[in-house]
């Protein structure tokens, strides 16, 4: 039986041809293994693009909320989610604003947050993401080797509420586990 990564191959090829930045096969396989192991119930994705990574994130039955600033890509993602049987709430808007608003309303809500949008915005959402993720929940961020992620990488590696490892795969990812909900 084909796994989800194999089924995503045509979308991966099309994305590369059209210049749509996606996770790709190698990091996709890593993420799929994490999703299978962690089985997150509630997932937040910042940066939907055409839905490639969202399909992986939602493939184990978790409830996916995903935020995309480009309305055309958001519509495309909705179609791709439907095609792959992924239940997702697609929010068209700015991820930084969405997270800020949500963090003012709820805390300890998501089991997993996946960040893969404007690199300079990673640091802007970090504190709100920490509020939103449950204790022992995870924040995964893509592209840690990018210059725009430097401040974020430094922050997650030294944050007192997180245990973080940098995954040396392609252009690196970070895997941060929330270890405390206490005010420090």
Language-model region placement:
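Hydrophobic "anchor" residues on beta-strands that sit immediately upstream
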Residues: 41, 64, 89, 112, ...
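Short conserved AdoMet
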Residues: 62, 107, 134
């Amino acid at each position: 039986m084909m796994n989800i990564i194999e089924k995503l191959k045509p979308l991966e090829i099309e994305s590369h041809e059209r210049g749509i930045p996606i996770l790709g096969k190698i990091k996709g396989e890593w993420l799929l293994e994490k999703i299978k192991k962690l089985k997150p119930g509630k997932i937040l994705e910042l940066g939907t693009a055409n839905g490639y990574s969202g399909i992986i994130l939602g493939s184990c039955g978790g409830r996916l909320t995903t935020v995309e600033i480009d309305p055309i890509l958001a519509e495309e993602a909705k179609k791709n989610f439907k095609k792959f049987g992924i239940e997702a709430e697609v929010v068209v808007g700015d991820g930084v604003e969405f997270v800020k608003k949500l963090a003012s309303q709820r805390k300890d809500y998501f089991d997993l947050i996946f960040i893969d949008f404007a690199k300079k915005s990673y640091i802007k959402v970090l504190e709100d993401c920490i509020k939103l993720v449950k204790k022992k929940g995870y924040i995964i961020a893509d592209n840690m080797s990018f210059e725009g992620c430097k401040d974020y990488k430094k922050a997650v590696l030294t944050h007192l509420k997180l245990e973080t490892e940098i995954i040396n795969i392609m252009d690196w990812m970070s895997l941060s586990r929330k270890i405390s909900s206490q005010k420090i």
